[in-house]
Amino acid sequence: MSATNSTPPANTFPTPINDRYFEDYVPGAVHRFGEMRVTEQEIVEFARLYDPQSFHVDAEAARASLFGGLIASGWQVTSKLMRLFVDNYIDKRTALGSPGLDEIRWLKPVRPGDTLTAWVECAAKVPSKSKPDIGVIHEHWGATNQKGELV
């Protein structure tokens, strides 16, 4: 997906969530998997527990920061995306875990009141050499705000 106005169409995965298997994932296919609105209360509560930097927990200090106002922790945004992914995209019966993440980038600040649209692109799929009935799906995730900007 490009870095400008990148919100894909509504969830277009042709296979229902409870029927998805390795062969159903098509490299290059992009699917939306949910929306979330971010509130000031959520930003502050998450940050107090996990990322207590002033621009996440103190609106006044945040106004004086380079961000010019309160912003969500990137870890909060990533966590919320993961929740949407689990609830709306992966098949809980066939998913076998993840070998890890290669890269995370937070491109624009997420602010109170933003509505984020989450999407996933199947970048590649690699059959297991030792277990031919399973494989690894490489994906790119992202989210756009209500302006269509990648965050």
Where are these regions (language model features)?
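Hot-dog-fold acyl-thioester-processing enzymes
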Residues: 2-100
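HotDog/MaoC-like acyl-thioester-processing domains
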Residues: 1-27, 106-115, 119-151
